[in-house]
C-alpha cells in the first residue's frame, strides 16, 4: 500500500527575518507560544481564566491579530501560523502591546485542530485572507475545503462563528459554496456579510482596494 504525503495549504520558505523578528522568535516563543503536541490542551488553564476563545488561522505578520486582541481584552485569542518571520513579528507585537490574552501555536492548523483542540471549545474562528492558490492545479491546497470546514465546525461551540475574508472573487465563491454545504452552518447574511467593526482594515487590504479588488467577508454561525 502506498501512502501519499499530506497536501499542505502552505509552502515553507526560508523567508527574511528582520532583527526584531528573529530576536522575538528566539526569545519570546517560550513565553507566548504554545508548543505543538499530539495531546489535547486546556486553554482555560493556559490563559488562567474562563473567557470566550477565538482562534485565528494564518495570522501572517500579526497586525490584525494584535489589533483585535488589544481591543477585546475580555476574550482570549489563539493564533496559528507556520511562517517563522510572521511568528516572530506577532511575538514582537504581543510583547510591545503587553497583551496577556493572545498566544500563538507555531504549527499546521490542521494538525492543531485534530490533536490539540478537542470538543466544541471555540467561540469564533477567523481566517483572514487565506492563501488563494489561484492555479486550478493548486486548488487542492486551499484551506477552505469541506473536510476542513467540517473539522472547524466540530471545534466550534453551538452558536459560535466562522469568519473568512478574501479579496479573491473565485475563492470567495468557492468558500460560499463549501460553507453553505455544511449543514451545521447558518449564513448570517444573504451571501457575503458586511465587514464587522471588529475586523480592522489592513494595509494589504487597502492596497487591494486601490487596485479595485473587492473584499468579501463570509460569516456563518454554528446551529445552536
Ligand atoms: C496570505 S497570508 C494572510 C495573513 C494574514 N491573515 C493577513 O490577512 O495579512 C496566509 C497565511 O496563512 C498561513 N497558513 C497557510 N496555511 C496554514 C496552515 N495550515 N496552518 C497555519 N498557517 C497557515 C501562511 O503561512 C500565511 O502566513
Curated annotation (Swiss-Prot):
Its EC number is 2.1.1.33. It catalyses: guanosine(46) in tRNA + S-adenosyl-L-methionine = N(7)-methylguanosine(46) in tRNA + S-adenosyl-L-homocysteine. It comes from the Bacteria. One of its GO terms (cellular component) is tRNA methyltransferase complex. GO terms for molecular function: tRNA (guanine(46)-N7)-methyltransferase activity. Pathway: tRNA modification; N(7)-methylguanine-tRNA biosynthesis. Keywords: Methyltransferase, S-adenosyl-L-methionine, Transferase, tRNA processing. The active site is at 131. S-adenosyl-L-methionine binds at residues 56, 81, 108, 131. It is an enzyme of class 2 (transferase). Pfam families: Methyltransf_4 (PF02390). Substrate binds at residues 135, 167, 202-205. The keyword Transferase applies. PANTHER family: 3-DEOXY-D-MANNO-OCTULOSONIC-ACID TRANSFERASE/TRNA GUANINE-N 7 - -METHYLTRANSFERASE (PTHR23417), PENTACOTRIPEPTIDE-REPEAT REGION OF PRORP DOMAIN-CONTAINING PROTEIN (PTHR23417:SF14). Catalyzes the formation of N(7)-methylguanine at position 46 (m7G46) in tRNA. Belongs to the class I-like SAM-binding methyltransferase superfamily. TrmB family. This is tRNA (guanine-N(7)-)-methyltransferase.
Amino acid at each position: 500500500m502506498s501512502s501519499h504525503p499530506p497536501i499542505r495549504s502552505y509552502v515553507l520558505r526560508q523567508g527574511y527575518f528582520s532583527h526584531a523578528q528573529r530576536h522575538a522568535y528566539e526569545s519570546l516563543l517560550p513565553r507566548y507560544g504554545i508548543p505543538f503536541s499530539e495531546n489535547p490542551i486546556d486553554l482555560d488553564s493556559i490563559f488562567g481564566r474562563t473567557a470566550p476563545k477565538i482562534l485565528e488561522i494564518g495570522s501572517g505578520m500579526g497586525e490584525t491579530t494584535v489589533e483585535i486582541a488589544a481591543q477585546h481584552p475580555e476574550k482570549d485569542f489563539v493564533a496559528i501560523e507556520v511562517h517563522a518571520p510572521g511568528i516572530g513579528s506577532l511575538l514582537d507585537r504581543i510583547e510591545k502591546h503587553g497583551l496577556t490574552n493572545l498566544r500563538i501555536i507555531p504549527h499546521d492548523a490542521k494538525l492543531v485542530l485534530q490533536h490539540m483542540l478537542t470538543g466544541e471549545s471555540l467561540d469564533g474562528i477567523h481566517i483572514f485572507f487565506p492563501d488563494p492558490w489561484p492555479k486550478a492545479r493548486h486548488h487542492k491546497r486551499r484551506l477552505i475545503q469541506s473536510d476542513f470546514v467540517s473539522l472547524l465546525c466540530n471545534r466550534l461551540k453551538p452558536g459560535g462563528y466562522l469568519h473568512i475574508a478574501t479579496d479573491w472573487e473565485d475563492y470567495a465563491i468557492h468558500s460560499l459554496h463549501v460553507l453553505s454545504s455544511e449543514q451545521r452552518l447558518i449564513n448570517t447574511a444573504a451571501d457575503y456579510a458586511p465587514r464587522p467593526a471588529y475586523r480592522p482594515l489592513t494595509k494589504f487590504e487597502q492596497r487591494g482596494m486601490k487596485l479595485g479588488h473587492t473584499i468579501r467577508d463570509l460569516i456563518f454561525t454554528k446551529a445552536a
